[in-house]
């Protein structure tokens, strides 16, 4: 079993670019189509580690879905981000849904 470092609804930062994001899904290993060598420079160890579907904002404040390796992310220590309140709201909404899911018939 592979343990993931981050959880769904957790706020994270891109380690190199510093962008704030929210984890919306986790894959136990890289699971998109087989990348060509020039598209993704990864080794087998990196591909076998968890990968995260993360929502971030572009420069215009529009949501962008990204797919990132665990090694590309770091924990976010702050709970509030006045410059990106939509990321705070998304994280709260996801965590709330995980704590009290609605049952459907």
From Swiss-Prot:
Q: Enumerate the Gene3D superfamilies for this protein.
A: Hemimethylated DNA-binding domain
* Cystine residue pairs: none
Give the UniProt subcellular location, in the record's own words.
Cytoplasm
Write down the InterPro entries for this protein, in alphabetical order.
Hemimethylated_DNA-bd_dom, Hemimethylated_DNA-bd_sf, HspQ
Molecular-function GO terms, alphabetical: DNA binding
What domain of life does the native source organism fall in? Bacteria
Q: What is its main location?
A: cytoplasm
GO CC, sorted alphabetically, is:
cytoplasm
Asked if the Swiss-Prot or TrEMBL record annotates the protein with the keyword Cytoplasm, the reply is yes
**Residue numbers spanned by region Disordered:** 74-105
Q: Which GO terms describe its biological process?
A: response to heat
The alphabetized UniProt keywords are:
Cytoplasm, Stress response
HAMAP family per UniProt: HspQ
* Cited function: Involved in the degradation of certain denaturated proteins, including DnaA, during heat shock stress.
Record-stated family = Belongs to the HspQ family.
- Report the protein name in the record: Heat shock protein HspQ
């Amino acid at each position: 079993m592979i343990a993931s470092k981050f959880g769904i609804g957790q706020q994270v930062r891109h380690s190199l670019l510093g962008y704030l994001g929210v984890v919306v899904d986790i894959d136990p290993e890289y699971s998109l189509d087989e990348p060509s060598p020039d598209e993704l420079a990864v080794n087998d160890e990196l591909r076998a580690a968890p990968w995260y579907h993360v929502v971030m904002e572009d420069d215009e404040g529009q949501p962008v879905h990204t797919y990132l390796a665990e090694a590309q992310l770091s924990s976010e220590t702050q709970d509030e981000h006045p410059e990106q309140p939509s990321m705070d709201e998304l994280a709260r909404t996801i965590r709330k849904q995980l704590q009290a899911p609605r049952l459907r018939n």
